[in-house]
């Protein structure tokens, strides 16, 4: 079992990374492999609505999004992390997730289907709950079980050293990791018992005015 931990911060070893690192340590204790995927600090284009992904089965913009999607095929679960920028996720992680999830949708890929997911947010002070809500939208649109902790998944601090003082925030990260590991074991056991996946329905697409 392996969980991909996506760092949506431009800082590879900053506050968001510190939260993901706490998750990674706990997953290791639970005998679950993980990998921290850095989206980096280079500009990431938003979706240009070209529709090429439906034919190419990957994004037409060949960058870190396609690198992630290759890894995602083999991953069993996902945790995305973002610092708060103006009470929302960063522009980079928003563009990244827009394109990754839209590519999976348009290419009819099962890369995210019924794989557990969660997000964490990092801020000096506020905006975490709005960011948390924003990032969870991707999972609920993709039939992904959302893993929760004992509080909204947020850490606070203006530096990694500050985050390490946020004892409750770090505990939230550990509880989240254990809940993710437990769900993965439950899913694995269900598959071994031959419990079938839910019946799929063809997607209906309607406009609100019709």
Protein language model annotation of sequence segments:
Residues 25-32, 98-105, 140-144, 175-190:
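Generic secondary-structure signature for well-ordered alpha-helical cores
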Residues 42-72, 204-210:
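Cysteine-cluster motifs in flexible loop/terminal segments that predominantly coordinate metals
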Residues 32-42:
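A short beta-strand-loop structural module common to alpha/beta enzyme folds
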Residues 2-30:
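N-terminal beta1-alpha1 ligand-phosphate binding loop
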Residues 145-210:
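Glycine-rich phosphate/pyrophosphate-binding loop and the adjoining helix
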Residues 60-151:
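Helix-loop-strand module that forms the ligand-binding subsite of alpha/beta enzymes
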């Amino acid at each position: 079992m392996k969980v991909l931990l996506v760092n949506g911060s431009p800082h590879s070893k900053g506050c968001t990374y510190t939260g993901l690192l706490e998750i990674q340590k706990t997953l290791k204790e639970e005998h679950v492999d993980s990998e921290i995927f850095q989206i980096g600090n280079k500009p990431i284009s938003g979706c240009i609505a070209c529709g090429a992904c439906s034919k190419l089965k990957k994004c037409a913009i060949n960058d870190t999004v396609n690198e992630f999607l290759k890894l995602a095929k083999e991953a069993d679960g996902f945790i995305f992390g973002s610092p708060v920028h103006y009470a929302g996720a960063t522009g980079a992680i928003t563009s990244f997730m827009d394109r990754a999830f839209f590519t999976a949708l348009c290419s009819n890929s099962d890369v995210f289907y019924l794989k557990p997911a969660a997000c964490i947010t990092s801020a000096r002070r506020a905006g975490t709950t709005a960011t948390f809500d924003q990032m969870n939208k991707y999972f609920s649109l993709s039939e992904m079980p959302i893993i929760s902790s004992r509080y909204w998944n947020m850490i606070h601090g203006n530096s990694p050293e500050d985050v390490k003082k946020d004892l409750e925030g770090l505990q939230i990260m550990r509880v989240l990791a254990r809940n993710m590991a437990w769900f993965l074991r439950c899913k694995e056991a269900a598959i071994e018992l031959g419990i079938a996946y839910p019946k799929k329905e063809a997607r209906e697409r309607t406009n609100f005015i019709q």
